[in-house]
C-alpha cells in the first residue's frame, strides 16, 4: 500500500470523504488521491517521494510556479510583524492600488478571504444597489458554493432556478435564473420575462469549471449591452481568469468593461485571498459607506497581502504575460497533434494561461450540453496514464488545466512525450 493510500484511509476517519474540497477525492477519475508533501517550481512531490509535472497549480493560484522565491521572501519578511491584526494596514492599500492599476474597471476594491466570499458579496451588493432580487448565471459556470449560486438548469434554455443538491432551499434558489453559456438569446429571454426584477448577471468570461470554454466573439459584449438595457449590474467573475488570461484579466483580453469584478486565486499568490471591486458609485454602497453589510475577521490579512503583492509584482514584469500564453499554446496544440497522430477524437482549447482537454469529435466546445457529450471515461483513462508517467493533470474531465511561468520548454516536451504514449494506449 502506498503512503497516499495509507493517508487517504486515515483521512476518511476524521475528514468527510477524506478531503477538504470534493474534487480532491479523485471521484471523477477513480483511484486514490495523490497526497502532496512538497512542491517546487513546476513540480509537486507526493508522500511517496514521486515527482510530477503539475498542471493543477493549486487550482490556479500558482501562476509563477510553486514556492516562488519572491513570494516566500515577502511572506517571511511579513510574518515577524504579526500574523493578523483585525485592523487596517499599509499593505492592503498597496495591493489595492496595484489591482486598480492592472484592472481599470475596478475603481474601489474590497479584500476578502476566498473567491466564494467575493462572488457572494458582489451579488449581495448588486441586490442592495438595485433593490432587485433575481440574478442570472450560466449553466456549467461555477461561482463558489454560496446558496444562490449552487443552482442548476432544468429543461430548456431558461428555467427558474432549481437547487443543485440538498441544503439549498427551493424558495431561495428560485431567484436564480440559469441561461446557456454562449447563447445571448437565452439571456434576452430572461430579461424580457423579468425586465424589472434582475439585479445582476454574473459570468465566467472563460468558463473554467466545465473544462475551458472561451466566449464567442459577441457574447461578453452582448451581455454588457443587455445589462445596460435592463439596468442590471454586470459582474465578471475573474477568480480563475484574473491575471491569467491576461494581466488585466479576461475583461482586458476581450475588451469588455463590467460594473463589478470578483477576484481570487492569483491575487493571493497561494495564500487565501479573494476580492471584489468595480464602479465607485456601486462599491460605496458597501458598509461602512453604504447600507449593504459585508465583513471578515481575516480580510486584508497582512501575510496574504504580502504574498499577493509579491505575486502580482513579479507577474507584471515585461514578457511574462506573453510567455505564459505561448507555453500554454505549445502544450495544448501539442496535445491535439498527438491525438490526431493516434486517431483519437480530441479537441484542446486554451486562452492565456489556461487550457482544456476534451475527448470529442466536435472541433469546438461552446457550452455545458456539449461538454456533457464528451467522453469522460476516456479522459479518466488518459489522466491515469499521464499520472503513471509523472504528469499531474486536473483529476476531473470538467476542470481546466493551468500553466505556470515555471514550466520550462523541457517540462512541456516531457509532458508531450508522456501524452504520446498515453494516446497510443487509448
UniProtKB/Swiss-Prot annotation:
Localization: Cytoplasm
GO terms under cellular component: cytoplasm
Gene Ontology molecular functions: glutamate-1-semialdehyde 2,1-aminomutase activity; pyridoxal phosphate binding; transaminase activity
Enzyme class, first EC level, given as a word: isomerase
Catalytic activity from the UniProt record: (S)-4-amino-5-oxopentanoate = 5-aminolevulinate
Signal peptide start and end residues: none
EC number(s) from the headed UniProt entry: 5.4.3.8
Cofactor: pyridoxal 5'-phosphate
Keywords: Cytoplasm, Isomerase, Porphyrin biosynthesis, Pyridoxal phosphate
Key word Isomerase present: yes
Positions carrying N6-(pyridoxal phosphate)lysine: 265
Alphabetical list of Gene3D superfamilies matching this protein: Aspartate Aminotransferase, domain 1, Type I PLP-dependent aspartate aminotransferase-like (Major domain)
Source domain of life: Bacteria
Biological processes annotated in GO: protoporphyrinogen IX biosynthetic process
Pathway: Porphyrin-containing compound metabolism; protoporphyrin-IX biosynthesis; 5-aminolevulinate from L-glutamyl-tRNA(Glu): step 2/2
Pfam families assigned to the protein according to its UniProt record, in alphabetical order: Aminotran_3
Assembly information from the UniProt record: Homodimer.
Family according to the record: Belongs to the class-III pyridoxal-phosphate-dependent aminotransferase family. HemL subfamily.
HAMAP family reported for this sequence: HemL_aminotrans_3
Protein name: Glutamate-1-semialdehyde 2,1-aminomutase
Gene: hemL
Amino acid at each position: 500500500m502506498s503512503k497516499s493510500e495509507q493517508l487517504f484511509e486515515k483521512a476518511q476517519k476524521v475528514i468527510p470523504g477524506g478531503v477538504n474540497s470534493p474534487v480532491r477525492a479523485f471521484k471523477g477519475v477513480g483511484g486514490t488521491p495523490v497526497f502532496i508533501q512538497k512542491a517546487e517550481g513546476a513540480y509537486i512531490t507526493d508522500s511517496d517521494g514521486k515527482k510530477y509535472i503539475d498542471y493543477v497549480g493549486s487550482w490556479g493560484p500558482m501562476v509563477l510556479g510553486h514556492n516562488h522565491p519572491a513570494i516566500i521572501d515577502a511572506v517571511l519578511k511579513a510574518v515577524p510583524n504579526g500574523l493578523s491584526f483585525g485592523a487596517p494596514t499599509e499593505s492592503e492599500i498597496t495591493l489595492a492600488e496595484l489591482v486598480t492599476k492592472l484592472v481599470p474597471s475596478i475603481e474601489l476594491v474590497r479584500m476578502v478571504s476566498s473567491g466564494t466570499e467575493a462572488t457572494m458579496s458582489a451579488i449581495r451588493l448588486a441586490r442592495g444597489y438595485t433593490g432587485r432580487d433575481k440574478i442570472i448565471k450560466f449553466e456549467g459556470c461555477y461561482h463558489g458554493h454560496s446558496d444562490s449560486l449552487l443552482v442548476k438548469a432544468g429543461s430548456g434554455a431558461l428555467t427558474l432556478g432549481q437547487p443543485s443538491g440538498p441544503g439549498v432551499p427551493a424558495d431561495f434558489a428560485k431567484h436564480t435564473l440559469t441561461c446557456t453559456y454562449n447563447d445571448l438569446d437565452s439571456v434576452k429571454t430572461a430579461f424580457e420575462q423579468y425586465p424589472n426584477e434582475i439585479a445582476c448577471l454574473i459570468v465566467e468570461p472563460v468558463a473554467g469549471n466545465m473544462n475551458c470554454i472561451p466566449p464567442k466573439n459577441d457574447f461578453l459584449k452582448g451581455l454588457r449591452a443587455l445589462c445596460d438595457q435592463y439596468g442590471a449590474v454586470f459582474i465578471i467573475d475573474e477568480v480563475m481568469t484574473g491575471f491569467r488570461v491576461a494581466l488585466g484579466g479576461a475583461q482586458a483580453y476581450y475588451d469588455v468593461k463590467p460594473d463589478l469584478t470578483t477576484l481570487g486565486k492569483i491575487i493571493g499568490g497561494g495564500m487565501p485571498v479573494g476580492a471584489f471591486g468595480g464602479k465607485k458609485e456601486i462599491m460605496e454602497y458597501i458598509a461602512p459607506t453604504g447600507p449593504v453589510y459585508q465583513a471578515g475577521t481575516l480580510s486584508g490579512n497582512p501575510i496574504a497581502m504580502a504574498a499577493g503583492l509579491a505575486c502580482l509584482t513579479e507577474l507584471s514584469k515585461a514578457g511574462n504575460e506573453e510567455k505564459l500564453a505561448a507555453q500554454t499554446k505549445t502544450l495544448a496544440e501539442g496535445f491535439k497533434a498527438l491525438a490526431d497522430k493516434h486517431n483519437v477524437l480530441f479537441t484542446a482549447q486554451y486562452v492565456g494561461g489556461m487550457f482544456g482537454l476534451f475527448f470529442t469529435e466536435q472541433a469546438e466546445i461552446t457550452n455545458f450540453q456539449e461538454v456533457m457529450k464528451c467522453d469522460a471515461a476516456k479522459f479518466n483513462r488518459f489522466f491515469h496514464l499521464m499520472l503513471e508517467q509523472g504528469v499531474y493533470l486536473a483529476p476531473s474531465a470538467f476542470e481546466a488545466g493551468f500553466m505556470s511561468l515555471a514550466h520550462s520548454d523541457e517540462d512541456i516536451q516531457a509532458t508531450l512525450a508522456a501524452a504520446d504514449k498515453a494516446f497510443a494506449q487509448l
